[in-house]
C-alpha cells in the first residue's frame, strides 16, 4: 500500500468517526483533539514496545501492530486536516535526514 492510499483510506475512516462524534457529542473533534489522540496512542506504542523488549510486561502485547497502524492513521489524518500532503511530509523528512547523515561530521560521504 502506498502513502496516497493510506491517506485516502485514513481520511474516509476519519469522516465516519466525525459522524459518530456529531451523533454522540454534537460536534466533531478538532485538530487539537486528533493530535492529542495521536499522542495517547504513541504513548501506548511506547508502553507496548517495553513489553516487546521484555522491559515491562503487558497483558495487551498483541495490540502493538494495531497501535502502530493507528499512529500512522492519525498522522495521515493530521497531515490532511492541516493541508499538508502526507507523502510529501514523509519524503521530505527522509530526504532531509539522509542528507544530514551523509554530511555528518566524520563521514567520508560513502556508506560504511
Regions found by a protein language model. Give the residues of each.
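Flexible "arm" and connector segments at domain edges
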Residues: 1-68, 72-112
Amino acid at each position: 500500500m502506498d502513502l496516497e492510499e493510506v491517506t485516502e483510506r485514513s481520511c474516509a475512516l476519519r469522516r465516519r468517526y466525525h459522524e459518530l462524534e456529531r451523533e454522540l457529542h454534537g460536534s466533531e473533534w478538532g485538530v487539537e483533539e486528533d493530535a492529542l489522540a495521536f499522542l495517547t496512542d504513541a504513548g501506548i506504542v511506547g508502553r507496548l514496545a517495553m513489553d516487546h523488549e521484555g522491559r515491562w510486561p503487558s497483558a495487551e502485547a498483541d495490540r502493538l501492530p494495531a497501535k502502530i497502524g493507528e499512529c500512522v492513521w492519525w498522522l495521515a489524518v493530521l497531515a490532511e486536516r492541516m493541508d499538508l500532503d502526507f507523502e510529501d511530509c514523509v519524503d521530505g523528512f527522509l530526504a532531509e535526514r539522509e542528507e544530514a547523515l551523509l554530511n555528518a561530521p566524520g563521514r567520508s560521504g560513502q556508506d560504511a
